[in-house]
């Protein structure tokens, strides 16, 4: 992560995030849909869950509101919107929108972002439900092992390895973005804007690379 951010800057991070985003999307969409098919579709999955849990638990799990009503439901909805506002305000995400080529591309970018989020987060929820049906409620002591184990059960080893890399891709895409934003904050916001407004672009690039390397090394040791 430090190497390609150091060498390529924003362009390298953008291209690697593009590839990583596709890996995550394929993992979160293909894996739960294949598992759902193995379980016999939606009806087969719900029947399996009902057999493994009490009727009340199964009803709550498959209920879009989770059994919440009234103020509890409203608080959950408002909390979800609150998370959405916070998500859109994260610096490493705003940097992506600030780099859009033109105002006309914002609409296209918005559609892509919303479509990706709906598919990815919807797939993540579905993956949890189908994993519960496939493995049972008490199979894992650590729920984070669910996705790798499900991938190994559903696909050949080589393809399962690619899907398991989806988790690594998620970590890398966040880490390189945070690294890039921190670097730009120090080199541009602090040094260029406050310390040396007359700094040349070549000097700023050198400083950015040095800061990237320092932050990466510190992060590794921490």
Residue ranges and their predicted role:
Residues 159-192:
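Membrane-helix boundary/coupling elements in multi-pass transport proteins
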Residues 5-11, 41, 127-130, 134-138, ...:
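Transmembrane helix-loop junctions in multi-pass membrane proteins
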Residues 22-161:
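Loop-to-helix junctions at membrane interfaces in multi-pass transport proteins
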Residues 1-5, 79-86, 168-176, 208:
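Helix-loop-helix module between adjacent transmembrane segments
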Residues 187-222:
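Loop-to-transmembrane helix boundary motifs in multi-pass membrane proteins
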Residues 1-2, 20-24, 28-31, 114-117, ...:
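Residue-level recognition of pore/gate-forming positions within transmembrane alpha-helices
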Residues 15-18, 99, 108-115, 164-167, ...:
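Internal alpha-helical transmembrane segments of multi-pass membrane proteins, especially GPCRs
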Residues 1-21, 96-102:
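Membrane-water interface regions at transmembrane-helix termini and the short interhelical loops
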């Amino acid at each position: 992560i430090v190497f390609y951010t150091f060498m390529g800057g924003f362009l390298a991070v953008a291209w690697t995030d593009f590839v990583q985003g596709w890996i995550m999307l394929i993992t979160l969409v293909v894996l739960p849909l294949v598992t759902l098919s193995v379980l016999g579709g939606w009806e087969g999955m719900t029947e399996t869950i009902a057999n493994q849990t009490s009727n009340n638990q199964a009803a709550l799990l498959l209920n879009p509101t989770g059994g919440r009503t009234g103020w509890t439901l409203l608080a959950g909805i408002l909390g979800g919107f609150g998370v959405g506002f916070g998500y859109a305000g994260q610096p490493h995400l705003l940097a992506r929108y600030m780099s859009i080529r033109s105002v006309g591309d914002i609409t296209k970018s918005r559609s892509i972002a919303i479509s990706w989020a709906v598919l990815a987060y919807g797939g993540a929820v579905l993956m949890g439900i189908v994993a519960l049906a496939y493995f049972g409620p008490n199979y894992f002591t650590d729920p984070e092992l669910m996705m790798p184990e499900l991938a190994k059960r559903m696909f050949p080893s080589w393809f399962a390895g690619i899907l398991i890399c989806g988790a690594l891709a998620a970590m890398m895409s966040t880490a390189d973005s945070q690294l890039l934003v921190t670097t730009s904050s120090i080199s541009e916001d602090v040094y260029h804007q406050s310390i040396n407004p007359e700094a040349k672009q070549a000097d700023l690039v050198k400083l950015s690379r040095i800061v990237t390397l320092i932050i990466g090394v510190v992060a590794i040791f921490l």
